[in-house]
Amino acid sequence: TVTIDGKDVQKDPEEAKRAIGYLPELPPLYVDMTVREYLDFVAELKKVPKKERKQQIDEVMEMTQITDMQQRLIRNLSKGYRQRVGLAQAILGYPEVIILDEPTVGLDPKQIIEIRDLIRKLGENHTVILSSHILSEVSAVCDHIMIIAHGKLVASDSPENLQKLMSGSMELDLEVKGSIAAVKSALQEI
C-alpha cells in the first residue's frame, strides 16, 4: 500500500492528493486573473477552509515574495514571478509533500538564488521532491539525491558522495581505423 502523510492512496485518494503540492515545469496559470484571484481559486479547489483562506494566501504570498504583485494580472508578470505564483499555489494548503519539476529553469541568476533559498526553507517543514536534470542545481538545495534513468533507480546518495563518484576518472577504449597521422590530426582538432 502507498500512503502519503498517512493517507492511503487507494482508500482515500482525495485526502492523499491534498497531502501533495505540485509545481510543474510550466505552471498552468490563468493569465486573466490577478495573483490573488488565482490563489483564491486554487485554495477553493484544494478545499482550504474559507475561514483560513485569506491568512494562508497572505502567508504563501509572503513566503514566495509576491505580496506586492497580488493585484497584478498574471499575464503581466515576468517568468520569475509566474514561477513564484506557481510555487505559491503548490504550497497552499500546506501539503506534507511538495513536488517541484525544474523550478529554476529559465530564471535569471538572482531569481535562481531566491528560489533555491525558498526550497531550502520549505524543506525544513515539508518533504520536497525536486526533479531536475541539472546536478549542480539539485546539489545546491538537496541533502539526498536519487538518480533515475529509464525508469530505474541508478544512484542514491548525498550530493557530496555522488559528486565524488561522478568526478572519478573514466576510461574509454577506442578502436580507430586509419593511419596514425590521420588519427593524431583528428584528435588535435577536438
What is each PLM-predicted segment?
Residues 87:
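Hydrophobic anchor residue at the start of the ABC signature
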Residues 73-77:
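Conserved ABC ATPase signature
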Residues 1-8, 15-16, 20:
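Conserved ABC transporter NBD signature motif
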Residues 116-190:
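ABC transporter nucleotide-binding domain
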Residues 40, 44, 51-69:
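Conserved ABC ATPase "signature" region
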Residues 98-102:
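Catalytic Walker B motif of ABC-type/P-loop ATPase nucleotide-binding domains
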Residues 94:
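Conserved catalytic motifs of ABC-family nucleotide-binding domains
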